[in-house]
A protein has these predicted regions:
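Terminal low-complexity, poorly structured segments
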Residues: 1, 30-33, 111, 139
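Short, helix-capping/interhelical loops that line the mouth of catalytic, cofactor-
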Residues: 1-22, 68-130, 165
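Short, contiguous alpha-helical
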Residues: 43-87, 125-165
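Long, hydrophobic N-terminal alpha-helical segment
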Residues: 12-47, 51
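Solvent-exposed, charged/polar functional surfaces in cytosolic regulatory/catalytic domains
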Residues: 33-37, 110-118, 152
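Bulky hydrophobic/aromatic packing residues
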Residues: 16, 29-31, 65, 89, ...
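Generic structural concept
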Residues: 24, 28, 53, 60-64, ...
């Protein structure tokens, strides 16, 4: 069987837009699932945790801050801009509140919508920023961490084990 290999397909802009839409959808589902867990848990369990053994509140704050931050990093890199701060947020349990979690979820959803609507059809895929664990990644590398991050933390929480992510 012979194949035609195309290095620059004509439908790349549509493929990119669909990828953004799909990742945003998975992230939205992750946020919904996370908020459901937060709503169902007691205040004691929500505020439990330590710097080395995170409780649900810390996980929620971490996921939502990362979701928003990565969406903005992806958009900046795609535009050829500096990514800004790329470190890992580690929330203290004493700083967790239900209202704060709801606010962070709204901010993450707003950033995801902005990513979906403002991502350029021909992004800069050469500019990179250092991920705290994976090293230098372009906008697509960063984008694809979002669903994995939700999945890792939420699966670990449901299974009663810590997530190395």
């Amino acid at each position: 069987m012979s194949l035609l290999v195309v290095d620059n397909p004509s439908d790349r802009p549509e493929w990119i837009a669909e990828t953004i839409r799909l990742v945003a959808g998975v992230a939205a589902e992750g946020r919904r699932s996370l908020l459901h867990l937060v709503e169902e848990t007691t205040d004691v369990d929500l505020l439990a945790g330590s710097p080395d053994d995170w409780g649900l509140g810390q996980i929620a704050v971490h996921l939502l801050v990362v979701d928003r931050g990565v969406s903005l990093i992806v958009l900046r890199l795609a535009r050829g801009e500096d990514a800004g701060n790329t470190g890992q947020p580690r929330p203290a349990p004493s700083r967790v509140t239900r209202e704060g979690i709801r606010t962070l979820a709204e901010k993450a959803a707003t950033a995801a919508e902005r990513l979906r609507t403002d991502f350029p059809p021909e992004p800069d895929d050469h500019r990179t920023a250092a991920h705290p664990f994976y090293g230098p990644m372009n906008c697509f590398g960063w984008l694809l961490t979002i669903p994995n991050h939700y999945n890792a933390h939420l699966s670990a929480y449901r299974e009663g084990r810590p997530s190395p992510l």
